[in-house]
Amino acid sequence: MKVVSRLRASLLLLTLSLLAAAPLAIAQTAADHADTILHPADLAKILPGSVFFRGQSATTQGRNSGGVHYADGFFTFATLVDNSGYSTGIQEKYQAYFITEVPITIGGHALAPGAYGTGIIKNASGAQFVVLDIGAHDLFTTDAVSDAKFRRPTPLQVTEGEAPGKYRLYFGRNYVEFERAK
């Protein structure tokens, strides 16, 4: 009789424990399905050591990378590259390799999934963000914003933007905001 009582008590305790833990598991699952900002350590497993652009291979700088891992498993990320083997005209514009698995918008411009060259160019009107296709042809240019208050700038990083679902791609203190296309 005592064995049956202990067994029932154990089963009751186990059931209560599982019921108490269920809301925590549901909350954790919901948190796991949010977009995540990626830092260099997060990208180490998926970032290639070198990338193809305009007929050549360029070494990536994993320490200067960042991106977003979307809740549905897709990625958008960028990394600085060693562009020393390219012509001066390409070096001026091609500073980072940008990969997106989903359609996004940058400064009002639509960008389809793919791999691109990107960079910040400075001219009389200020800093501009340029996007090039894999053949180094200009796709679009948009104004970059200078953020003098940005603490601890690095050569390249991604942060959350002003609104949910918006992200900032920083080159030093200059940034452009991007979001997943709707």
Model-derived segments and spans:
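Short hydrophobic/aromatic segments of transmembrane alpha-helices and their interfaces
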Residues: 9-10, 95
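Bacterial N-terminal signal peptides
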Residues: 10-22
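Generic detector of short alpha-helix boundary/capping microenvironments
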Residues: 15-16, 61, 96
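Generic detector of short, well-ordered, non-transmembrane alpha-helical segments enriched
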Residues: 23-24, 104
